[in-house]
Every structure is written in structure tokens, then in C-alpha cells.
């Protein structure tokens, strides 16, 4: 595809999405739910066909030398197909945020002012090897009254196209425009460059992918983005922590899963409790094969307790998202140093304190500048499902618009509505 052809193709996709977004904005809840349930039924009906198509993507990935983890993300197993269908049904069961009016108040002039929740419009979603994102993203955008342009990874092009056909079938069956969900059908990377600059058609970009993808989009995008670059999450064990809670929470925050962006990467411990808190916790970490990168004070304390195999932490370790069985540990003087460290080195994603001191906990959640701040809870809870959002399209550590897990409400905005009885301004 030449550059001219690609630009013409992307412009056509953009125009169709913009037109469809107007129809979606006025679509009834019943029609949107009907579409979601029809798509779920179609996925179950065509499960064998989807697996056959997906097998071709998987075969190409293996032939191209992709590793087992990549192939696993790409594969549409029976479980993955079942989860996609169930996810659609769960989103259909969620309350529809569109049209909700809130904050109504009467003004002295006689007018009544409120805010109505409305769709964002056209959402561009860029993602990599997971074909299930095609359905997750389409479902959330559909339920929130948006149109979406989906640009998945080239490695999943056949799977994504097959899933998009089922989405179009569901939309049409409910009387909604099939163009409300479009998958970019070219694997040309220039399509991403055009998508992120189509300000005339696209209202927001949501990237779902690795750090290199996000960094590129941050440099090149002209369309606003909902994104997070890193998940450098902390837990601070305060001097007034309950040790059982500290061990349980910190073990879970690091070792339940290593790859998610809400996994703890740095553990901070008050010097007043380090000698009691760290040995039992670090014993668990070492038994699970976690490499411990420690500050000098932590090394001295742990070696005195009989630990070996420790690695010195360097300045860059405090800024790393390992996504691996590696944990940086720093002993700090107390709350002030912990807050300062998190705000300096963290990624404003999710941070937690373990403490039984109410005032300390409240100061921590006030002063730590992150999208999610917790008391006596694992950072792994930073998730749309766990927050009761039903589902999420991603997590944002930006400060404008959506912050934290982005569910249906995060794909909407508020407009002011005014009710009057012929009032005029004097």
C-alpha cells in the first residue's frame, strides 16, 4: 500500500467512525446491550472457526521465532474464548453511564444547572499481541456510546479481523452502524502514525502495549492519549505496621504475578521496624526465587540475620519497572523519606502503606502523588474489576481526564446542561 493509498484508507476509516459515533451517542441502552449479547453468542457459535483462524497467526509467530510467552498471549484457547464471551455479557449487565445527569442546582437567576455524561466520540486503540483486546475494547467503547478504531499487532491480524466481523454482525443485528467498531486491516506501521495524528476524526488514543510503544506515541501523537508509561509501584512498611499484615500484603504485591503493571517493584521499610519486618519477608522472597536488590542499610541488617545472595541496589534501580522476580528494597528514616522517595522515583501509578496509625495513613494518601494510593492493601488491587468498575480499558497515571483504572465512565465526559423558564442575563 502506497503512502497515498494508506492515508486515503485511514481517512475513510476515520470518516466512517466519526459518522458512526453520532449514531452511537444516541443509541439506547437496550440496543447496545442487544449488540453485546449477540456478539457473545456469535463468539461461542464460531469458537472452532476462531481457533482455526488464530492457529494461522500462532503458526506465523512461531515461524518468526517469537517466544513462548508471546505465543501464549496470542493464542485463543477455549478458556480465552469463553472469557471473551463472558466479558461481553458482564459489560451488558453494567449500568449505562450515558445520559446520566448529576450535580443539579438552582441558581439565583432561576436557571437550573447540571452535568450530563456523554461519550467521548471516536476512540483509537492501539495494542499488540492479544486478540482478546479486540473484544474487550470494542465492548467497552460500544457500551459507553463511542465509536472505535482498533489497530492490533500485525501478528494477530487474522484473529482480529475475524473477531471484528462478529462485532459488526452484532452491531448490525441491533440496528447500530457496523462502522462503530473498525479494525485497521493493514499491517503497515504507518497506519499507526496516521491514526495518532487524525485530530479531525479521533478524539482520544488509548495505547495498550509495552514501554517502547507508549514512548513512541508520546513523541508522535497529536491526538490526546489515556495511557501509563511505567508501573513503578511501592509498598512502605511504617514503624506502626502490623507485621502479619505487612508480610502478607508485601508477599502478594510482589509474587502473585510479576508482569502486571500494578506489581510492587520497590519495598520501603521504616528503620524502626526493618529488623523485625524484613527477615521473615525476605525469607519468603528468596524461597520464591526473587532477587533482592538492597540499599547498604538493608544489606547490613539482612546479613546480620544470616542472609546471603543479596545484590547492591544502585540509583537506577529505584526507577526500574522490573516486571520480573526482582525487588528493590530500601530502609528509610520514616514517613517523610518514604513519601519523598515515592514522589521522586515512582511512576504515579499505585503505592501502598502498611500502618496501624490512622494519622500516618491519612497523611500518606494525601501526600503521595499517584493515581491509586492504599492503606493496608496490596498494590495488585489497582484494577478496574477489583474497583467495581466491571471492566477496564487500561490504567492511566496522567492527571487530566481519567486517572487510575479506566472503565466505562473513563470513556465519557461531562457537558453542562441548563434548564430555564425564559430567563435572560442582565
From Swiss-Prot:
A Pfam cross-reference name: Aldedh
Q: What class of enzyme is it?
A: oxidoreductase
Reaction(s) catalyzed by this protein?
L-glutamate 5-semialdehyde + phosphate + NADP(+) = L-glutamyl 5-phosphate + NADPH + H(+)
Q: What are the annotated GO cellular component locations? A: cytoplasm
Main location (coarse class): cytoplasm
> What are the coiled-coil residue ranges?
none
Q: Where in the cell is it found?
A: Cytoplasm
Example of a GO MF term: NADP binding
Source species, domain of life: Bacteria
Which UniProt keywords are listed? Amino-acid biosynthesis, Cytoplasm, NADP, Oxidoreductase, Proline biosynthesis
User: Which pathway does it operate in?
Assistant: Amino-acid biosynthesis; L-proline biosynthesis; L-glutamate 5-semialdehyde from L-glutamate: step 2/2
Q: What is its EC number?
A: 1.2.1.41
User: Record's Gene3D superfamilies?
Assistant: Aldehyde Dehydrogenase, Chain A, domain 1, Aldehyde Dehydrogenase, Chain A, domain 2
Q: Which GO terms describe its biological process?
A: L-proline biosynthetic process
Q: What does this protein do?
A: Catalyzes the NADPH-dependent reduction of L-glutamate 5-phosphate into L-glutamate 5-semialdehyde and phosphate. The product spontaneously undergoes cyclization to form 1-pyrroline-5-carboxylate.
HAMAP family associated with the record: ProA (MF_00412)
Family listed: Belongs to the gamma-glutamyl phosphate reductase family.
Q: Which named protein is this?
A: Gamma-glutamyl phosphate reductase
Which species is the source of this protein?
Cupriavidus pinatubonensis (strain JMP 134 / LMG 1197)
**Which gene codes for it?**
proA
